[in-house]
Amino acid sequence: MTGQHLSTDCNLVLFDLDGTLVDSAPDLAGTANDLRAAHGLPALSYDALRPMVGSGARGMVGVAFGVAPGDAGFEALRDAFLDRYAQRLLAHTRVFEAVVPLLDKLDAVGLRWGIVTNKAMRFTAPIVAGLGLAARAATVVGGDTTAKSKPHPMPLLEAARQAGVEPSHCIYVGDDLRDVQAGHAAGMSALVAAWGYLGLGEPIEAWGADAILREPNQLLHWLQLT
């Protein structure tokens, strides 16, 4: 674990979803390759697709078809991607194996936790429910729950409001630079989940996080629960 600060004043742990709590890459990568096949294109390797999972449909369509928002055909490809993804949300998506005991420990000590993701609630809600997380989470905020999404702090502030916890008593754990940016903008400690997707930008050591967690159980040490 990188980062020396230890939190003894945390009343709510907020997690990103994709790449932090759950491994959704197999279903998102599979959707991208299904759409490529529909356009007569060969499959891309899983390793080529996985880093962009955290960027959602925009990132997946971008790497699969080499297009960006504003390019001709982007919106049609994005909509087709989302339609296909909606049919396989839980085909292979699972809670990361090492995250399971982490959540169990948080529950056992009575430290509440929640989810803040840029994924739209029409996808987030069935995934969270299907994986048995909905009844356990103190709050679930999706990408369309508030007027702005991460890196804006609004979703994190809404999660804190729903849980009745001051932002300064929350921490946020995510696997993307925008997670660190959003957490700090909300007045929270921000930690990197280094087991996640991480994108293809600057190295995580340059993100300015309060700590880099190499594996989920390191969060327990950071919280002084071990």
Please state what every model-predicted region is.
Residues 2-51:
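Active-site neighborhood of HAD-like aspartate-dependent phosphohydrolases
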Residues 9, 87-115, 121-125, 153:
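Short, acidic loop-to-helix structural element flanking the phosphoryl-transfer center
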Residues 12, 150-180:
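Conserved Lys-Pro-Asp/Glu-containing loop-to-beta segment of HAD-superfamily phosphomonoesterases
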Residues 53-87, 100-107:
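A metal-dependent, Asp-based hydrolase signature
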Residues 133-148:
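A short, structured active-site edge motif that brings together acidic residues
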Residues 171-211:
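Acidic, Mg2+-coordinating phosphoryl-transfer loop and its flanking beta/alpha structural elements
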